[in-house]
Regions:
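Bacterial N-terminal signal peptides that target proteins for export
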Residues: 1-11
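Extracytoplasmic/secretory soluble proteins
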Residues: 11-13, 17-532
Length: 532
């Protein structure tokens, strides 16, 4: 089935190219320049219809009326239909669509080719977009501008092709982490936490003062907390693991993968989380998805005093609270057994995929060109960040001056722009320029980022682990192993954290189950296929 998809894709891509050549003339067949320029095809006066999957976050629900969506679609000449899928179900829905080839949208946002998608790509379910650089001149130019050519080339799979257009960052930044009640720390004489022992002592004190509370609560789902905490323990596994496998972690010193989910590092992390749970310090309401309003209410009312979340959410919670002197602060990563680290990030992020079925459209080239303009052109990428000049901001020389409704908003500029205008909505914004982003935050945020940059020799935020260069058969084998491993791990994580399974008496059974599911073979596949 998958092999036939590959053949179908080859045929449809050839047909699409032929149609593009007929529309553009023979000049379209010439190799593009380094900047990726190419003559645009003749287009209709009518907007091009494009359907799209969008990963919807409950703390930032999608709206068709967002200014950024409306303006960029108009500029690119797109009649856009967005299917907003809850972020907790998103990967499952994408996997189903790509595996079956049924009811696929034209465009899938917020994806990469780690894990199962590698197999799907190599077996023909996803368009190798790097084959068509002349259709993505804006993407090419932005890659060149930000100096990310090598970073983007690293995303190629075993066949030398890249299957998505990634988010582009000039530099990663610390946008979320541990957020706590600063007013409580000041009242009780606590210093800012530096270690997980410090965190435990603060949570324990708050519980003693507020017996009905669960001091540490969770945003959206437990995986948000896990992915921000685990790197300080030297691991990243589970639903939002940095490797994209759910099971494996990456050893940055050795430059290789290891069975992170069954490591002693994992056991140590789970023991810490179980300790918090057993002592009533961790919110037991962890079933995903967690409503954003519920999370905000818990923080604002004092039912909780700590969370792992994002800086732009602080203003809204502070405004909602009726507690005198209520004040939140975000802190740099806490030091654990492996140092102080945050969830890994790279200068490229998840991006845009075109399912193979999109290549069957007669106007496939126009679809790609429209998407390229809507997300990567200078004009549109600026709108996704800043909004529309004259509406959300004006320019005073080189200085960005935000509108009064943004500067006076109790939720802060960044969050208000997200909620009201769709600017900075992660699945939609594909060009992130640090200096421009920092203009939306206050001096406190800039200072936090400066502090983080000076820790761990500038390595608090480690790069994402490398993607193995699987061939199509190995990618299929890896994908077939990954799913049962990842599913089982989620069950065991929950059991260990809540105490329904013991980290002492049940750990060996857990390890045995993972080995029966061939985690060692899975890890060997990854290491054997790393780029040399």
């Amino acid at each position: 089935m998958k092999k036939s998809l590959k053949k179908i894709l080859a045929f449809t891509m050839a047909a699409a190219m032929a149609a593009g050549l007929a529309a553009c003339g023979s000049s379209a067949s010439t190799s593009p320049s380094a900047g990726g320029s190419g003559s645009a095809p003749t287009v209709s006066d009518e907007p091009i219809k494009i359907s799209m999957y969008y990963a919807d976050n409950p703390t930032l629900p999608y709206m068709d009326s967002w200014l950024a969506v409306q303006e960029t679609a108009k500029i690119a000449g797109v009649d856009l239909t967005v299917e907003a899928i809850p972020s907790t179900d998103y990967n499952t829905k994408v996997s189903l669509a790509l595996n079956t080839g049924e009811n696929c949208p034209d465009v899938i946002l917020y994806q990469d080719t780690k894990g199962e998608n590698s197999s799907l790509a190599l077996n023909g379910a996803i368009v190798p977009i790097s084959d068509y650089p002349e259709w993505t001149p804006n993407f090419n130019a932005m890659v060149e501008k930000l100096g990310l050519k090598d970073d983007v080339e690293e995303l190629a799979l075993k066949d030398g092709k890249r299957y998505f257009m990634p988010q582009l960052f000039d530099q990663p930044f610390y946008d979320g982490g541990l957020i706590m009640r600063q007013d409580y720390l000041e009242e009780k004489g606590f210093d800012a936490p530096k270690t997980f022992d410090d965190l435990y002592e603060i949570l324990k004190a708050y519980k003693a003062d507020h017996p009905d509370s669960y001091p540490l609560t969770t945003l959206v789902a437990p995986y948000v907390t896990y992915r921000m905490m685990m790197p300080s323990f030297g691991i990243s596994f589970g639903k939002s693991s940095s490797s994209g496998t759910g099971a494996l972690s990456y050893d940055y010193e050795k430059g290789e993968y290891f069975e992170g989910c069954i490591s002693e590092e994992a056991r140590e992390y789970l023991r810490f989380m179980n300790k918090l749970y057993a002592e009533g310090l961790l919110d037991p309401e962890m079933a995903a998805p967690i409503d954003g309003d519920v999370w905000s209410t818990k923080m604002a009312t004092g039912a909780a005093m700590a969370t792992y979340a994002y800086y732009d959410q602080i203003g809204g919670v502070e405004t909602a609270s009726e507690i005198d002197g209520f004040k939140l602060q975000m802190y740099p990563s806490l030091e654990g057994p492996a140092g102080a680290h945050h969830q890994p990030k790279s200068k490229t992020g998840k991006g845009i995929m075109f399912p193979a079925s999109t290549a069957e459209r007669d106007d496939f080239e126009q679809v790609v060109r429209a998407v390229d303009e809507m997300f990567f052109s200078e004009e549109c990428s600026t709108i996704w960040c800043l909004g529309v000049e004259g509406t959300t901001y004006t320019m005073d020389g080189d200085k960005i001056v935000y509108s009064d409704d943004l500067t006076s908003s109790p939720d802060g500029i960044y969050k208000t722009m997200q909620v009201k205008y769709g600017c900075g909505a992660d699945p939609f914004q594909f060009v992130w320029i640090n200096e421009r982003e920092m203009s939306k935050y206050d001096e406190n945020y800039a200072q936090i980022n400066k502090t983080v940059a000076g820790m761990e020799d500038g390595n608090v935020i480690q790069p994402l682990p490398p993607t193995p260069l699987f061939d199509d058969l190995t990618a299929e084998d890896a994908a077939s192993l990954q799913t049962p491993l990842a599913d089982s791990i989620e069950v065991w994580i929950d059991a260990f954290v809540t105490g329904s399974k013991s980290l002492d008496t049940d750990w060996d059974a857990y390890v045995a189950e993972m080995k029966n599911l061939q985690i060692e073979e899975f890890c060997k596949m990854y290491n054997d296929n790393l780029r040399k």
